[in-house]
């Protein structure tokens, strides 16, 4: 510890004052190295007097007149004056002088070889401060030489806890700017600047007669790019390409993948990109050569621009480096700047899927149509939903407007209109029978005879494709067993009739004023629905989701205690979509609904001892972003109808207009009511006054009529789950090249009991020094085929001397908890490039 320097001094001084004869000891500390420490020196038989340049006469008088018996250490924090200027010269002649060489003391105390004492002496100004000296000690360096001493000094000035040049550079880059950097100013203050540039040369191959921090960082970014861009570098960049690419790649990967410093990396990347005129040079390269480059956000901008061009031309077969557009989108999202372009890549991926699959081909037979929609075609609605979900996150959508128009045209004209017409024609041919359970039979089929407590969550306008996303989320939960099916909804497909159909009943009917009645009773409020439910299930309850959100556990549990059936009414999608001001937020509402329902199920299961849930809806919806022109609306419905909406009309007579279909209320409800329900054949709307025109329901389409039913059972006991593991496939025991690729495999597919995770994979020495770049692996593959879960990683090793007799390891750490999950011993058999001149 630093205190040992003072102990050595104290011991020496105490030995001087050990005799009974009075002694005066003068200590001229030329560099004021011990000015901060002098008062902490504990002398056993003497006192300390502070000598200043202007109090020499007083000190002389004090020592020779006022106190002539006490031993004194006279400390002067300056060099000994010449005899002419030293008024204590005659006193010193009969006293003793003390000399403390801090460099010698430090060298001795730290166990530094005597040959490195000049290094300590060169930087002795650094050690004049007690706090700096202590921090130097705290680094606990084992082997001292010029390099380790200088790096340690820099580490202290950068406030680093370990002596590492990589950490020094990391602090310099992340804690201040590239111009007028405060740490470089500190280095200059203590004469460390040339040492810093020497270290930059040794570690990263940066050597410049007029070095600057900006040029060092340009060297690192250009060298990194040169190893991932598969073409010749621009002439202007070539002087910045370093042969120490392994060290540079390792440092850059660690910095960009750091949770703490990733954002600062992004800022530096932008500065360098502009400084080297990156946009101009990269635009001239073939885009295929840029696919693996991930240290400039500008690369993603160019790739996105290329994908946009392909999709605008509906070129769904386009590939880069053998990768399809969806594969590129997935891969680039996982790269460092993927988080910055997450929305853009999701937009493009969903646009691709829409272009590839959105051109609907009619299906014969309503049962075939139902099967195809519930198994695959629903995904087209999902592609559209997620396209706009991410599109709406962009601040500037200009670049994507042509694709948006293409997606809108395909969805509206080549998919939605076609499938709706196909649906209505096939449904009419089948006399309105899809073969599915009718929504009005829901209670009788699924609730009435349930032996355990069941919670029915009715989410207003939760259409089938949105429910399927929720189902997939439930399925991925190891504590949930979920299945999904569809019911045939009612016409009109709107809230009053849909909610009534889910209640137990003997009859459902319209009053003369077109109110929906269940067993002759109103059913529009929660209280009215609960009264009806209790007539069939005494131990039952109806509650609104919003009233439960902030409940404490005891209050939540009380809702379910003693109940056989609980209906929970959730309204997120319809509440947002039915208002003109917020209808374009409906896809955001869908995501929120999924999360709210999932969280509700988990919460009720864990806090209220209830484990069986059924999620369903009153109806679905149709949503189109572009507003319908007035000329495209079906006129005449409002004047002839007693009850009318944009997608339905109920009246005593048919609406005589092209593109309008009809059925009777009696057919829908199983009664003798002959009133006519009219609805558009395609996805258009009636010309009526009312709310928005983008979000509509009430008509007859798969999106409106196929009501989802998710059956969820939550396990009381937790299943044993594990994280997806990775293993080394390559039979490698020796590394012979600075660039090495290895094959790995994700050992099991992600499932309900095997959860996805991410790993950091790199090489280390026996002393835990990181010797390669760091690869981030996201273990999220679900393929059953093992070969499809294999992947290859590239490692760039530091260009340094490796000892073949020492142990080195390939290691993998779980990125979430920093637990080591893989350690594979290897031999490093690489000839040192600097020795043999392999790289010029």
What are these regions (language model features)?
Residues 1-453, 463-613, 617-840:
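…; additionally, a secondary subgroup of soluble metalloenzymes is captured
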Residues 460:
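Ligand-binding pocket scaffold of soluble enzyme catalytic domains
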């Amino acid at each position: 510890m630093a205190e040992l320097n003072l102990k050595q001094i104290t011991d020496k001084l105490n030995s001087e004052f050990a005799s009974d004869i009075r002694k005066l000891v003068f200590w001229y500390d030329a560099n004021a190295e011990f000015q901060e420490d002098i008062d902490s020196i504990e002398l056993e038989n003497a006192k300390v007097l502070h000598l200043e340049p202007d109090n020499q006469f007083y000190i002389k008088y004090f020592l020779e007149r006022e106190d002539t018996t006490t031993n004194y250490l006279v400390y002067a924090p300056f060099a000994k004056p010449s005899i002419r200027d030293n008024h204590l010269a005659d006193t010193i002649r009969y006293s003793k002088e003390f000399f403390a060489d801090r460099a010698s003391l430090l060298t001795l105390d730290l166990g530094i070889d005597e040959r490195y004492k000049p290094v300590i002496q060169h930087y002795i100004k650094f050690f004049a401060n007690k706090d700096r000296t202590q921090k130097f000690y705290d680094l606990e360096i084992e082997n001292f030489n010029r390099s380790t001493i200088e790096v340690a000094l820099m580490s202290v000035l950068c406030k680093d806890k370990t002596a590492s040049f990589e950490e020094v550079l990391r602090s310099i880059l992340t804690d201040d700017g590239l111009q007028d950097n405060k740490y470089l100013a500190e280095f200059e203050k203590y004469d460390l600047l040339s040492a810093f540039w020497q270290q930059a040369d040794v570690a990263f191959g940066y050597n410049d007669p007029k070095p600057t921090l900006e040029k060092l960082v340009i060297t690192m970014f250009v060298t990194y790019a040169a190893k991932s861009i598969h073409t010749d570098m621009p002439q202007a960049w070539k002087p910045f390409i370093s042969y120490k690419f392994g060290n540079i790649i390792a440092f850059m990967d660690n910095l960009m993948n750091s949770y703490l410093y990733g954002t600062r990396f992004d800022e530096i990347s932008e500065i360098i990109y502009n400084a080297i005129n990156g946009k101009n040079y990269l635009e001239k390269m073939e885009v295929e050569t840029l696919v693996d480059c991930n240290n400039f956000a500008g690369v993603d901008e160019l790739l996105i621009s290329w994908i946009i061009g392909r999709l605008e031309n509906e070129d769904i077969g386009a590939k880069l480096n053998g990768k399809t557009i969806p594969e590129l989108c997935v891969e680039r999202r996982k790269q460092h700047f993927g988080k910055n372009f997450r929305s853009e890549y999701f937009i493009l991926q969903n646009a691709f899927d829409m272009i590839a699959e959105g051109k609907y081909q009619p299906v014969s037979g309503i049962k075939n149509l139902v099967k195809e929609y519930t198994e695959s075609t629903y995904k087209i609605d999902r592609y559209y939903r997620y396209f706009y979900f991410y599109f709406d996150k962009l601040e500037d959508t200009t670049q994507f407007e042509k694709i948006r128009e293409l997606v809108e045209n395909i969805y509206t004209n080549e998919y939605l209109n076609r499938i709706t017409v196909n649906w209505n024609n096939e449904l009419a041919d089948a006399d309105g029978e899809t073969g599915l359970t009718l929504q009005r039979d829901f209670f009788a089929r699924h609730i009435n005879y349930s032996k355990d407590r069941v919670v029915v969550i009715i989410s207003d306008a939760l259409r089938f494709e949105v429910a399927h996303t929720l189902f997939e989320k439930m399925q991925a939960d190891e504590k949930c067993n979920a299945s999904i099916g569809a019911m045939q909804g009612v016409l009109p497909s709107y809230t009053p009739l849909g909610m009534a159909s889910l209640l137990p009943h003997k009859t459902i009917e319209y009053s003369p004023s077109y109110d929906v009645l269940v067993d002759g009773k109103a059913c529009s409020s929660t209280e009215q629905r609960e009264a009806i439910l209790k007539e069939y299930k005494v131990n039952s309850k109806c509650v609104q989701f919003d009233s439960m959100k902030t409940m404490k556990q005891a209050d939540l549990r009380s809702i379910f205690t003693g109940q056989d059936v609980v209906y929970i009414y959730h309204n997120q999608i319809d509440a947002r979509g039915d208002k003109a001001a917020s209808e374009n937020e409906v896809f955001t509402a869908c995501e929120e609904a999924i999360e709210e329902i999932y969280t509700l199920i988990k919460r009720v299961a864990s806090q209220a001892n209830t484990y069986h849930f059924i999620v369903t809806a009153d109806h679905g919806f149709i949503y189109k972003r572009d507003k319908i022109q007035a000329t495209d609306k079906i006129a005449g419905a409002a004047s002839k109808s007693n009850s009318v909406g944009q997608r339905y009309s109920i009246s005593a007579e048919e609406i005589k207009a092209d593109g309008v279909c009809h059925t009777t209320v009696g057919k829908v409800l199983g009664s003798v009511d002959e009133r006519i329900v009219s609805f558009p054949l395609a996805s258009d709307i009636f010309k009526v006054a009312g709310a928005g025109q983008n979000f509509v329901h009430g008509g007859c389409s798969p999106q409106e009529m196929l009501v989802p039913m998710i059956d969820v059972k939550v396990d009381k006991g937790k299943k044993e789950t594990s994280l997806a593991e990775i293993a080394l496939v390559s039979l490698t025991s020796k590394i012979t090249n600075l660039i090495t690729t290895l094959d790995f495999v994700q050992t099991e597919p992600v499932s309900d009991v095997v959860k996805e995770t991410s790993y950091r994979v790199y090489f280390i020495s026996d002393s835990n020094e990181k010797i390669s770049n760091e690869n981030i692996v996201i273990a999220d593959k679900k393929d059953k085929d093992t070969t499809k879960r294999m992947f290859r990683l590239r490692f760039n090793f530091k260009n340094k001397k490796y000892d073949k007799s020492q142990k080195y390891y390939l290691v993998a750490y779980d990125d979430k908890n920093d637990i080591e999950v893989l350690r594979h011993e290897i031999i490093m058999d690489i000839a040192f490039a600097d020795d043999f001149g392999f790289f010029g």
